[in-house]
Amino acid sequence: MRTTYCGLVSEMLLGQTVTLMGWAHRRRDHGGVIFIDLRDREGLVQVVCDPDRAEMFKAAEGVRNEFCLKIVGKVRARPAGTENANLVSGKVELLCHELEVLNPSVTPPFQLDDDNLSETTRLTHRVLDLRRPAMQKNLILRYRVAMEVRKFLDANGFIDIETPMLTKSTPEGARDYLVPSRVNEGMFFALPQSPQLFKQLLMVSGFDRYYQITKCFRDEDLRADRQPEFTQIDIETSFLDEEEIRGMFEGMIRTVFRAVMNVELPGYPVMKYAEAMHRFGSDKPDLRVKMEFTELTEVMKDVDFKVFSAPAQAKGGRVVALRVPGGGEMSRSEIDGYTEFVKIYGAKGLAWIKVNDASKGREGLQSPIVKNLHDAAIAEIIARSGARNGDLLFFGADKAKVVNDAIGALRVKIGHSDFGKSGGLFEDKWAPLWVVDFPMFEHDEEGDRWAAVHNPFTAPKDGHEDLMDTDPGKCIAKAYDMVLNGWELGGGSVRIHRAEVQSKVFSALKIGPDEAQLKFGFLLDALQYGAPPHGGLAFGLDRLVTLMTKADSIRDVIAFPKTQRAQDLLTHAPSPVDEKQLRELHIRLRNPAAGQSGV
């Protein structure tokens, strides 16, 4: 039986005989003495195999990388000058007495300490990739985060209750993953995008504090921080108001950081959605980046430069400047690179001005656009932006959404660049905040209708109920997002607990009474039985752990993730199924050839 882990062998065990089990990370033959670095989930220990024990030494000679081994030996101090300060076991080594090969290994397709592996190679050989110390560290930290979350919620009276995985398809924003029913021909289940409705029903049922750490599913285009299946820390509580809910779960995240990383998070500023969009063009601003927008829409309405004046005069248009302190030293090729970057977000281009001498007005500026701006506009740009000599101003002028997306992304990109970090535009710290007072609705131009910003079950601010009938665009929601370093870590809201208010929201969304009853009748019925005031939120566990580990991708903190094409390169899912299975499910493929190709 194993007596300890490799990575836990330390000076505390000097002189003791221990039994270890793990994998040969590296084997070295030094003049008749064989050294084996034995590895397990806790780390490495150096094993010394002397030729004095012939049978053991012969077995050691046959060991290769990734052989699974059992080793019995005595812990001793390493010779002076050979210590390794990077390891817990770095001051000791194990003198091998017995060595047993539990299972040999074929030659691995890569070295586990190769840091230049492609993600395709890593995901194809995920079993081996997960043996890498960095991956094991990530997943162990993930476990510790989940454990601390459970401890906190249990201590605060929350009950872990499971909700169904096979449920009803309801409009929640993204596409559902559908599961055909064999028993009920032509009918489909949906995999849950969130347990939203069930947790509200649990509040009506009297379980006033609920949580679960559960899988959710969304069939949407993937990005670096998205997966088709993801893990959510889902929470709901009755009888607490918005401020109390925020306070409790800010405390939870503080507890997790303190317990897992020994980090004390700073205070959480509370910022209204409108302010976040005005200053940063984003509802999840990265406060580590020390640049903000300068609003110029009114200033640009009367300039003789259509690139600025047209969006400034248009309904829903916006013109802003982004001051980059010290940016005057940027080369034209760097500026051109940023111009191409903003086009990804729909911008047509990127106007700029270099400030050589702010005191000289027009004469102290360098830019192809200066000639198109009158003196008053130039003076306003300099004054409002606070531009100084050596600064660079970038401009966004378009529909507000395009400006916010493009210049908001530019702000983050410059801040995170080598230029930004060396120029003091980025502060490496933990920067949390709450964003509150989101709009209740946003207008869908294509469908010419209102859509819920969060979900249709979010309560409006007190006194805003009537705006749903008269002016939905001005209706503010009791919604809140926790943002950390530019990532939405979690989001939630106070929910609607009165059936008549819920019906009003459905009406604003052009969901008629019959459709509402068909899709949400079970909720409307439940709300009539004394539903308590309630609210909650959900945190993305994958995102939280990605931030805490500073991983390059969310896929580095998930044991068996999907690619950006929603494929599993290890198991080759999704995969074709045979005709018999399709017949049982009453399914016929429109394009049978499409179902024949694997990953």
Swiss-Prot record:
InterPro entries: Aa-tRNA-synt_II, aa-tRNA-synth_II, aa-tRNA-synth_II/BPL/LPL, Asp-tRNA-ligase_1, Asp-tRNA-ligase_1_N, Asp/Asn-tRNA-synth_IIb, AspRS_core, GAD-like_sf. GO terms for molecular function: aspartate-tRNA ligase activity; aspartate-tRNA(Asn) ligase activity; ATP binding; nucleic acid binding. It is found in: Cytoplasm. Residues 196-199 are annotated as: Aspartate. The keyword Ligase applies. Aspartyl-tRNA synthetase with relaxed tRNA specificity since it is able to aspartylate not only its cognate tRNA(Asp) but also tRNA(Asn). Reaction proceeds in two steps: L-aspartate is first activated by ATP to form Asp-AMP and then transferred to the acceptor end of tRNA(Asp/Asn). This is Aspartate--tRNA(Asp/Asn) ligase.
